[in-house]
Amino acid sequence: MLDVNFFDELRIGLATADDIRQWSYGEVKKPETINYRTLKPEKDGLFCEKIFGPTRDWECYCGKYKRVRFKGIICERCGVEVTRAKVRRERMGHIELAAPVTHIWYFKGVPSRLGYLLDLAPKDLEKIIYFAAYVITDVNDEMRHNELSTLEAEMVVEKKAVEDQRDADLEARAQKLEADLAELEAEGAKSDVRRKVRDGGEREMRQLRDRAQRELDRLDEIWTTFTKLAPKQLIVDEVLYRELVDRYGEYFTGAMGAESIKKLIENFDIEAEAENLRETIRSGKGQKKLRALKRLKVVAAFQTNRNSPMGMVLDAVPVIPPELRPMVQLDGGRFATSDLNDLYRRVINRNNRLKRLIDLGAPEIIVNNEKRMLQESVDALFDNGRRGRPVTGPGNRPLKSLSDLLKGKQGRFRQNLLGKRVDYSGRSVIVVGPQLKLHQCGLPKLMALELFKPFVMKRLVDLNHAQNIKSAKRMVERQRPQVWDVLEEVIAEHPVLLNRAPTLHRLGIQAFEPQLVEGKAIQLHPLVCEAFNADFDGDQMAVHLPLSAEAQAEARILMLSSNNILSPASGKPLAMPRLDMVTGLYFLTTMIEGDKGEYRPAATDQPEEGVYSSPAEAIMAMDRGALSVRAKIKVRLTQLRPPAALEAELFENGWKPGLAWTAETTLGRVMFNELLPISYPFINEQMHKKVQARIINDLAERFPMIVVAQTVDKLKDAGFHWATRSGVTVSMADVLVPPQKQEILDRYEAEADGIERKYQRGALNHKERNDSLVKIWQDATEEVGKALEEHYPADNPIITIVKSGATGNFTQTRTLAGMKGLVTNPKGEFIPRPIKSSFREGLTVLEYFINTHGARKGLADTALRTADSGYLTRRLVDVSQDVIVREHDCETERGINVTLAERQPDGSLIRDPHVETSAFARTLATDAVDADGNVVIERGHDLGDPAIDKLLAAGIDHVKVRSVLTCASATGVCAMCYGRSMATGKLVDIGEAVGIVAAQSIGEPGTQLTMRTFHQGGVGEDITGGLPRVQELFEARVPRNKAPIADVSGRVQLEEGERFYKITIVPDDGGEEVVYDKLSKRQRLRVIKHEDGSEGVLSDGDHVEVGDQLMEGSADPHEVLRVQGPREVQIHLVHEVQEVYRAQGVSIHDKHIEVIVRQMLRRVTIIDSGATEFLPGSLTERAEFESENRRVVAEGGEPAAGRPVLMGITKASLATDSWLSAASFQETTRVLTDAAINCRSDKLQGLKENVIIGKLIPAGTGINRYRNIQVQPTEEARAAAYTIPSYEDQYYSPDFGQATGAAVPLDDYGYSDYR
């Protein structure tokens, strides 16, 4: 199958001026857009038809040619080509600049690429580009060296002349002063007059001296500057530069602005520079080496690929097609235009003015100013606001530049390429459809008609209800009666997709078979609400229609709701009875002592009662009113399987349908068991929600999905039926306040008063008082709760609802009827005054306000949490999107050890509580062997519940399982390492996008995690929990309360100072001691297991193992990586993330977290490059690193040395090989800048890249191995296809040609291209 846009990779690079001119269809010379009278584009303007193509199909500008027959002609009057108007979306123009400008991305990005290339500081670069300083581009060293002595002599002569002049002037002035004084003396002037004259004379002489000295200093400065003149040197002083040019102009050239940068790049020798930098890296140290490494990255980029650094300085600016920056007329004659037109107009205006000034031969200062303005306008066009104040439009709004069009949520990448709107879709409010089967949904008639319109129209024409498509369309629009019959027919067997936003995991979109319903609301099956997280308080859902046969097949086979009963996160069923259904089944299976028609054994005076020969007889008795559903009876059963223990006792060969046995149970329970599959053992207990969950779990593990779907549907129907009959309602009368409440409160109030008195006397400090009060009132609340529980009758509806597990919990009941108890303030501390009223009695004003405090915090928290959790999911999806199952088995021997059970001192095994999320659904990596060496289960076997039970029975407590952490696949993971797909219960299929499933499984419960950081005991010691902790782990940040870990195994020496601990570890192997000092006493020492088995705080002389934590808090994952290596840090991260989710009662399988952690440790940082191409300090994929090293070693070279790095998910997503994926994630401009300089090529292997370019994603059924399937007929089919029909068919058909009628052996013919 061929793709429409079939290309293998996508490359990005720097465009040179020649490229830009080649793309262009003409130069834009005028800033005009359209003529305000005729509303036609101006010639040579930004919308010119001559450059960009005609505005109307097949019409030139002047109207000489109108019609398709002139296609391709260029009109000789107006120069417009006669073609489609669509070309205005793809034809580009350009602006020839009168002076070169630099591209702001490469100059202003951090780090400045231009600065690194030319070895100039960004500040200096800015001065040069924006005409604040001159830069020396070239010095003629040889000439200067040869003539230096002559020039020096000239300089000496000049200085001598200045000095002589100075001496002569001073001499003359001194003589004049003498003469003046003599004259004054002769006139007999006063002494102060004489003094003034003398002072004046001396002052003038001082000025003469200073002026001469300044002149000499300037000559010195000019000379020293000249002798030390070197390329890339900045001269900020304009006067100094002028003097240099006047005197020594022939020895050097200098310039300012982008032209000087262009010259520097032209003269730049990339090869030599790269060699120098490599040398510096080999021999250098410290800062110098770091700088060289960073520069080499940029220099080497230009050295290896076809990019020319000249692309960073532009001589021409491309103009994007006019349809991509449209101008639209609003009503009222005004125009709305894209900001780009404004930005382009500024560039053109300034460029034209600059051309004119140059032609006029204007003074350099004016020309330079205009060039600076041109540079600024091009900067604003590419990235407005990156440098200086942004250019604003009307209303002081910054204009959106080309970069802004790509960036952020509203940018091209995320808004248009990754989030397109879809045709054949609709949305409406949802209501419950309890009569539906699990795989059905109710679709409003009108909606269905609109969605299936083309199908209906075609069918109407086929059935001759309409002559042509047009009349069929009219029929549909007028909703003629025949249309509905046809719609029924078209809609059959055509699944539709339902989606509820926010789609947090893949079960947010499921396929259903539509059933037409009246009204305008979509009807949704009650059991799928859990997966969609939908309720019927006004939620809306969207409907999408899969069109192609493949899409319909996928929807039916993979997405049908009855095939998606299990959660992809934990493998537990999601389609479970909830709420009313649970209540109904709980009611049905309750047994009530002494109810009507109860079984009574035979006594002397009366026969036995309540014994029935079959369930049917019991039901008849119930219908007569002689028996209650919940009464205990004895009944003979033939169609229900006895419980396992009983079956073994009664039937040696096992039970078969039809064999009779007697059960002591209730009619309700018999009816419940009739809903289950026939071979499922009888369950004789009350159906709490947990029990129902256990049963469905069991069914999912043992029966095909179809059976499970049918069973849950039956349970739903029975649940609703009996919930209605049970008459469970809630009214005010059901909320009973316990009578002993007041007495309990008075007792505790007295205790609290005692504490308060102690506090007033100063016997307690504030904290102690608060803690005591909190303790007292917590006890009080608990006691009221107990009293409440004893006071309520068992058949109270509220208690029934809570006890059955339908909804609510006991705390809520206590709040309603008992007392609310203590509440927290926004800091999370308890307010020591309790709320003594219940909601039934009503709160006092003070209590009400205390209560609102915490409640509002809760609401604000939820809103923040939703946003944070969504962002976490987005980062997780981005980092893991290219983890796809690529092969069946990577053949690795490695795996990880998981615990199945805890071995007790007496040798018995207690099943580990976390088996469900660790060992379950994995593949064994080695044979599981019991104590006697017998193989219980061989390697490669899948660990389901039965297998785990078998291992525990054999006394095995540890097994080694395959894991994605140890998978050896180069790209993606293999099916055996991943193990069973949680959603299907079978080995994962090749092509499954396990990365995205993992991200969704971790992100979806994110909203349930708390935002808060808890305060637990101790001073100032916060335990970060909830969402912040998960983010901290996945971003690989240093934790907030970092705890040191032991670098080596050894004995601890602990010293206590005033404010700090100092811990020294003496290693067991006699190595160097490891010292940890300055450990703050605000963190407590860790509780560890001592060698004698007791637990206690770490103390002097204890023994610690490598990697043990020494203080309370969280270990820094980077430290764990350094001390214990990559495998340990992976296990550490998985464990820590699980801790957070388990604390919230969320069940996620370890394998999902492992997929993400695997992505965090994919890279290696190069320490020494050896004979490879890698740059030291660069990050490389582990697979690439290993294959390159193998290649070099095979050639006899020195391999590279590297160490694994742990990257946070954001950093890992940005470091991906695919620049398209990284650019559409975050920091778009930075990613594109880097990719362009390195001339990066995108192999299009991940999902996002393919979505962006509009190809099918390489996952699921879009993976190559499924799309390149060819159907080859079998021998029989070929024989059938190629025989000649015989005459007995009553058809006369002559023989064609000389063939015998035998099958043609197609295998002998090549299928290659016949050319």
Swiss-Prot record:
Catalytic activity annotation: RNA(n) + a ribonucleoside 5'-triphosphate = RNA(n+1) + diphosphate
Essential cofactor(s): Mg(2+); Zn(2+)
Gene Ontology cellular component list: DNA-directed RNA polymerase complex
Binding site for Mg(2+): 535, 537, 539
Residues binding Zn(2+) 2: 890, 967, 974, 977
Pfam family, one: RNA_pol_Rpb1_1
The protein's Enzyme Commission number: 2.7.7.6
InterPro entries: DNA-dir_RpoC_beta_prime (IPR045867), DNA-dir_RpoC_beta_prime_bact (IPR012754), RNA_pol_asu (IPR000722), RNA_pol_N (IPR006592), RNA_pol_Rpb1_1 (IPR007080), RNA_pol_Rpb1_3 (IPR007066), RNA_pol_Rpb1_3_sf (IPR042102), RNA_pol_Rpb1_4 (IPR007083)
GO terms, biological process: DNA-templated transcription
Entry binding sites for Zn(2+) 1: 60, 62, 75, 78
An example Gene Ontology molecular-function term: zinc ion binding
CDD domains: RNAP_beta'_C, RNAP_beta'_N
Cofactor note: Binds 1 Mg(2+) ion per subunit. Binds 2 Zn(2+) ions per subunit.
UniProtKB keywords: DNA-directed RNA polymerase, Magnesium, Metal-binding, Nucleotidyltransferase, Transcription, Transferase, Zinc
Subunit structure, as described in the record: The RNAP catalytic core consists of 2 alpha, 1 beta, 1 beta' and 1 omega subunit. When a sigma factor is associated with the core the holoenzyme is formed, which can initiate transcription.
Role summary: DNA-dependent RNA polymerase catalyzes the transcription of DNA into RNA using the four ribonucleoside triphosphates as substrates.
Similarity comment: Belongs to the RNA polymerase beta' chain family.
Name recorded for this polypeptide: DNA-directed RNA polymerase subunit beta'
Native species: Mycobacterium sp. (strain KMS)
